[in-house]
Amino acid sequence: GDDVKSACCDTCLCTKSNPPTCRCVDVGETCHSACLSCICAYSNPPKCQCFDTQKFCYKACHNSELEEVIKN
């Protein structure tokens, strides 16, 4: 669906198993659009994290200059 296509993650952690088990550990006011189990802390603004695991990482949400420096 479109939710998976629009989902993004800046910080994705994967195990070294084959296939890998990956989880997005971004913390924000909402979870990404494809998240099924989103846990939010009752704070203002809320701090939400997705606890789904996949065999892949979603694309990055932000292409910051810092990330570009690391790639070069």
Curated annotation (Swiss-Prot):
Q: Where is this site: Reactive bond for trypsin?
A: K16, S17
S-S bridge residues: C8-C61, C9-C24, C12-C57, C14-C22, C31-C38, C35-C50, C40-C48
Query: What start and end residues bound the annotated signal peptide?
Result: none
Under Gene3D superfamilies, the record lists:
Cysteine Protease (Bromelain) Inhibitor, subunit H
Note the site residues: Reactive bond for chymotrypsin: Y42, S43
InterPro entries reported for this sequence: Bowman-Birk_prot_inh, Prot_inh_BBI
Q: Could you tell me the superkingdom of the organism this chain comes from?
A: Eukaryota
Cite the Pfam families for this sequence. Answer: Bowman-Birk_leg
Question: Could you tell me in which tissues this protein is expressed?
Answer: Seed.
Query: Has keyword Signal?
Result: no
List the GO terms this entry assigns under cellular component, sorted alphabetically. extracellular region
Which UniProt key words apply to this protein?
A: Disulfide bond, Protease inhibitor, Serine protease inhibitor
Q: From the Swiss-Prot or TrEMBL record, what is one GO molecular function term? A: serine-type endopeptidase inhibitor activity
> Which family does the UniProt entry place this protein in?
Belongs to the Bowman-Birk serine protease inhibitor family.
What does this chain do? Answer: Inhibitor of trypsin and of chymotrypsin. May function as a natural phytochemical defense against predators.
Record protein name field: Seed trypsin/chymotrypsin inhibitor IVB
Q: Which organism is it from?
A: Pisum sativum
